[in-house]
Amino acid sequence: MSTTISPLAPKKYPKMPVIEGVRIATAEAGIKYKNRTDLLAMVFDAGTAVAGVFTKSKCPSAPVDFCRQNLAAGKARVLVVNSGNANAFTGKKGRESTALTGEAAAKAAGCTAGEVFLASTGVIGEPLDTTKFSHLLAGLVSDGKPDLWTEAAKAIMTTDTYPKVATQTVKLGDTDVTINGISKGAGMIAPDMATMLSFIATDAPIAAPVLQDLLSRGTAKTFNAVTVDSDTSTSDTLLIFATGKAAKRGAPEITDPKDARLGQFRRALGKVLKSLALQVVRDGEGARKQVEVTVTGAKSARSAKRIALSIANSPLVKTAVAGEDANWGRVVMAVGKAGEPADRDRLSIWFGDIRLAHEGERDPGYSEEATSTYMKRDDIRIRADIGIGRGKATVWTCDLTKEYVAINGDYRS
């Protein structure tokens, strides 16, 4: 957790409402950080449904394996998250650590270890010493309070400079239901996964298979469309918990992902996921600018996304944005290297509403002065039209500054 808050941090945070059936507690376990919370326990009433998506890394952490195993049953009672140590690439010791944590949390909550979910974030390759926090779990589980959402977001931070929270309240049938979410992430952020760490809870009575469908679809245009540094984490975990408590107030129980009554909920969940994903981008390590990259006119939507990610992940594009240099030639380079169908002589490029290149050459109306003024903004939009089809996609990233190098060069020291 940095002491210097990102200039792109939210100017204000939403008031996070209570989700019936969820209790939260945090503690200072001293796993890596001093004088700050680094342990989170989220406790759910019996009957809570759960769904999740995880990293696609071939080197997943021990907690990711633990969660994948437990997810099949679709029920959750406890979530335990630690920051400062990822418990990844830790072999047998890592598996033993998750087992011990799961057993301690289950004993504290009076449930089975199969209803416990774990997540860890921090340094890779160092064994996680569960003795630093396992004795704290009983107190956390019993002392949880329903209104500590921002405190929960703070406890899971690593190099983040601010806590990331989002909320939406919508109708399910004729009844209000609430969706709350927290997230962490600032570096080792790239798509093709879930997210860094993110946890969503709702009081809506939605079955686990439906939650899984909603989450898998919802991440495609949110968390799977953000990148800070093109590095996919070993620990990426996104879990959603549904306590079902709104059923007492008349909310209909949803067991079919095609249920028409899900429309508003699906859109609200999408807003929560997008808000959290963009907060991660805006807290990218050393970031000073958010960058939205849109590709249109590609052969397909998949092709458009690959080209957009090629642009968004290009160090040369990102450093040009950091230097407020409208170097559109680097966008041309990134399109060309993407390995997707493209036609040089049909390519057009915009920064904001300013067209810089058109049909394979610099736009005759190009103004260096106007473009330089645009590049001084905090939020930059880059668009590339490939000119060969109807495929389109949007991804988000941030600039690449010398602070990113400093943060990651000093991370373990």
UniProtKB/Swiss-Prot annotation:
Active site: T195
E.C. no: 2.3.1.35, 2.3.1.1
Origin superkingdom: Bacteria
InterPro entries noted in UniProt: Arg_biosynth_ArgJ (IPR002813), ArgJ-like_dom_sf (IPR016117), ArgJ_beta_C (IPR042195)
Catalytic activity: N(2)-acetyl-L-ornithine + L-glutamate = N-acetyl-L-glutamate + L-ornithine; L-glutamate + acetyl-CoA = N-acetyl-L-glutamate + CoA + H(+)
Record pathway: Amino-acid biosynthesis; L-arginine biosynthesis; L-ornithine and N-acetyl-L-glutamate from L-glutamate and N(2)-acetyl-L-ornithine (cyclic): step 1/1; Amino-acid biosynthesis; L-arginine biosynthesis; N(2)-acetyl-L-ornithine from L-glutamate: step 1/4
GO biological process: L-arginine biosynthetic process; ornithine biosynthetic process
Annotated GO MF terms: glutamate N-acetyltransferase activity; L-glutamate N-acetyltransferase activity
Site (Cleavage): A194, T195
Annotated binding of substrate, by residue: T158, K184, T195, E285, N408, S413
Pfam families recorded: ArgJ
Subcellular location: Cytoplasm
Top-level class of the enzyme under EC nomenclature: transferase
Function statement: Catalyzes two activities which are involved in the cyclic version of arginine biosynthesis: the synthesis of N-acetylglutamate from glutamate and acetyl-CoA as the acetyl donor, and of ornithine by transacetylation between N(2)-acetylornithine and glutamate.
Subunit note: Heterotetramer of two alpha and two beta chains.
UniProt-recorded name of the protein: Arginine biosynthesis bifunctional protein ArgJ
Organism: Mesorhizobium japonicum (strain LMG 29417 / CECT 9101 / MAFF 303099) (Mesorhizobium loti (strain MAFF 303099))
Underlying gene: argJ
